[in-house]
């Protein structure tokens, strides 16, 4: 007889009722065992990222099931590409994504900090302290750390371009582009300042387009004050350069109208076929005439058109670009002050945009070509055009630039800064440890554990730089306490000074606050889980 897979209880009248079904088909772990399992999974993920922290951090190579290779040291990208099975490890992936979505930078640091907090929490659990007490203590310690960050922060002059470039260089220092650090930092700053509204402290990232083309060197990367699209003129004999162009942006196809309903066309003679061909030709000519009469000197079409239409456009001296995607159409309309026209009959002079220069740019021996629309009336649309030896380098350069753009955007939003090299975390750790001495309850243990976890950031920076981590950290801590200078950090690039203010290693207060807050919240969530039930037939890391 098959054993029942449900848990049964009986009421006072002896009637059975089911409490939980499929008990035997579930795997269950509870209590301290569950918490420790989760801590182990989260720490495993954090340790993977630990070696990628800082300017001397190492890259990771990630190969997808399809064979696509990604080489990166961007925390969010590593986490996204990792095939994580354990559900708590997936929380760490989401943590990195949250930091990337909200701030854009600090995605590696936030995961490393969360892993260190969980490591310290495990030690406290082994000493018999309840996980909720630990979580409550971490929350209070987090509040104290954030207060310390606020007190040591400096006001940043956003109008000073040179200081902005220095901040972007800090973000780019650990990336593949660090050999062209200054150039990429200037590109990032100029791109953000081009689209930023300083008064409302707003930066519209949709106005910054990133394009890449394999070939050339990273140093060939440029910022174009306009739009670059991966298209060419539709006919090889059309002009490769237009000055003071009047641009018509069309979302209607260059073809005869088609019936909306199902239809059948009977062609029984050559005369019928000629009549059909003549009708198509007349339709094309009417459409071209309408565009020409509006005063347009360049037609940009969302849809394609056949060779006959292309020939007629060339014959009528009307340059055209076909198959331009929706996002590019919108950017072009904003940049040129054009209206997007859905029907030829609606096209008029008022709906045209203007561009001072439209030109095809060529690359390499193969003469790859792209179209550049520059000198537009609305200069709040720019394109960062990235070059590199292969697609992997270009993709990683784009990710690096994205982080730098986010850092500059955050400074426009909130101009307060702290100094890097682990100096801010160490200053916060010193103050949290001091606060622990003033607390009577069990939370004091959590405060000290939180301080130790904060020290994991400068320690990881020292490890990745080839320094003796414990010696470097103890010396640095003693100097900070002795001098009271919160800008003393790990000299990861061997510049000869520990003062990050002198080295111009700058990080945004917004990013640091978010890292500590998010890491503490996720750790609290993990510590509060004490019972896990998973289907026994699924492999989920348990």
Curated annotation (Swiss-Prot):
InterPro entries: Chap_CCT_epsi, Chaperone_TCP-1, Chaperonin_TCP-1_CS, Cpn60/GroEL/TCP-1, GroEL-like_apical_dom_sf, GROEL-like_equatorial_sf, TCP-1-like_intermed_sf, TCP-1_chaperonin
Single GO BP term: protein folding
Signal sequence, renumbered to the chain: none
One GO cellular component term: chaperonin-containing T-complex
Gene Ontology MF terms: ATP binding; ATP hydrolysis activity; ATP-dependent protein folding chaperone; unfolded protein binding
Record keyword Nucleotide-binding present: yes
Protein keywords: ATP-binding, Chaperone, Cytoplasm, Nucleotide-binding
Cell location: Cytoplasm
Domain of life according to the entry: Eukaryota
Function in brief: Molecular chaperone; assists the folding of proteins upon ATP hydrolysis. Known to play a role, in vitro, in the folding of actin and tubulin.
The family this protein is said to belong to: Belongs to the TCP-1 chaperonin family.
Subunit structure: Heterooligomeric complex of about 850 to 900 kDa that forms two stacked rings, 12 to 16 nm in diameter.
Protein name per Swiss-Prot or TrEMBL: T-complex protein 1 subunit epsilon
